[in-house]
């Protein structure tokens, strides 16, 4: 419902011409720490759990709850939560482009990124800080940026996790529990709660 009403608002043309969208994760997550390898719990068929992943000794940090932080099993926070925020930003930016008479966005023509494991001193392998830029073809091109700071104790545009699309007449912020629309002067003109 949240995305349906947000996209309807964007398709009504309230944002004007939109060139840029942003998705972000700026919620503080704790360190996963370091633990020594050990024995898998008796009720776990660890070989089955590993599947086709490289064989590694059992470690509680590479198991349920934190497996996503290791190259062999997951994709870090970009693949865990980031994909949901990117999906919101992409859908709203594509709706804006279509409203302007353009083709829906498809594959980016260029992707660049930077980041690293700069904050946590723990067993996690994936970055804890990252910025990625997706450039979509068109005249003019459109840009979607993703920013991840999983050590950050503060919100961005009022949301710890979210997406936004910026136009020359206004912008929309999409959060986990609803969305808010603003004029180009920053006055909130519409708010919608719910999932």
Predicted regions and their residues:
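Contiguous beta-strand/loop segments that form the cofactor/metal-binding neighborhood of enzyme cores
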Residues: 4-11, 16-76, 80-195
């Amino acid at each position: 419902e949240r995305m349906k009403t947000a996209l309807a608002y964007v398709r009504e043309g309230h944002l004007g011409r939109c060139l840029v969208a942003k998705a972000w994760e700026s919620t503080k997550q704790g360190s996963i720490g370091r633990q020594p390898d050990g024995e898998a719990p008796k009720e776990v068929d660890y070989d089955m759990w590993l599947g086709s992943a490289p064989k590694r000794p059992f470690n509680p940090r590479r198991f349920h709850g934190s497996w996503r932080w290791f190259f062999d099993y997951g994709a870090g926070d970009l693949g865990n939560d980031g994909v949901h925020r990117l999906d919101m930003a992409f859908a709203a930016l594509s709706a804006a482009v279509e409203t302007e008479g353009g083709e829906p966005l498809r594959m980016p023509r260029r992707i660049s990124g930077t980041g690293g494991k700069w904050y946590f001193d723990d067993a996690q392998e994936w970055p804890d800080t990252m910025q990625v830029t997706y450039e979509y073809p068109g005249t003019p091109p459109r840009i979607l940026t993703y920013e991840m700071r999983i050590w950050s104790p503060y919100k961005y545009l009022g949301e710890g996790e979210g997406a936004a699309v910026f136009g020359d007449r206004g912008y929309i912020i999409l959060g986990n529990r609803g969305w808010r629309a603003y004029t180009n002067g920053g006055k909130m003109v519409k708010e919608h709660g719910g999932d």
